[in-house]
């Protein structure tokens, strides 16, 4: 769709104008069976945002391997809407084409956060990670890893093509729903 392409071009231009190149990032994430892969995203945070995590640790409002801060100072000014509407995730369709990800599945976590996994969490590595999933349509802004894990296991245990289609169809509703937006 031309409008989507134009919209992505506008996101790219705004990001480059506000914080320079590159307009996308590659992050090491954990995929199927613990395979490390490079996940692509539009860059909405400052260049050294991952390194700043340690200095902002006391502000972290999440548990386990999650890291979320309300009004995160690492986000580039005026790009909050890109994150709010998950536009930064669109480059992950390249990961789907490469076979590293699926459209639906558990969200891939950073490779350097796996030390926070206990044995039961490893079960989420038995499926391809996804761009969207049960978490994203039910409680996408939760800061509790146990909630993430609960939805991941529910997805794994109930997987079907029909289930994936339902999740895909509900994703836009979840993204634009006021009741789900938050942290």
Locations of the language-model features?
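Conserved short-loop catalytic and cofactor-binding motifs
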Residues: 66, 78-81, 153
